[in-house]
Amino acid sequence: TRLSRGLGDVYKRQVSLRYFNVYGERQPLRGTYAPVVGLFLEQKKAGKPLTIVGDGEQRRDFTHVKDVVKANLACIDSVIGGYQTINIGTGKNYSVNEIAAMISDNIEFIPERPGECRETLASNSKASYYLDWEPTIDIKDWINEYEV
């Protein structure tokens, strides 16, 4: 926005980190827009079917909270000038169906929500350039290690 850029010009440094579908320890487990990974794990734990919204072919770039923390720390230590918006994601996406299949085969589809995005996929080029940051945790590996 113009206000953000104006403040960036005055204070010479303003950075926004844009997170992509954060999951991991202490993730929210309730609410309409709670992260799907946490919801699925909670549903499996309760012995319930995993509820997939729509056809499940929506694709998401899932980022582990530890990678988000590392990106924030790298940003604090960086010497970025001006105004920058930096994506924090993995640069790889999975369909909701793929994530569900990693957790359980007990699946139920529910109606699609209007206006839901079909795909998210981060470009980490700025994070790599400005923060010397790369993601280290893949969701497949995390789910396999998690007690499912």
Residue ranges and their predicted role:
Residues 1, 18-19, 55:
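Short, well-ordered beta-to-alpha junction loops that form the rim of enzyme active sites
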Residues 1-11:
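Single conserved hydrophobic/aromatic residue that forms the stacking wall/gate
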Residues 5, 44-148:
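C-terminal substrate-binding subdomain of Rossmann-fold SDR/epimerase-dehydratase oxidoreductases
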Residues 12-35:
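Flexible, glycine-rich beta-alpha linker
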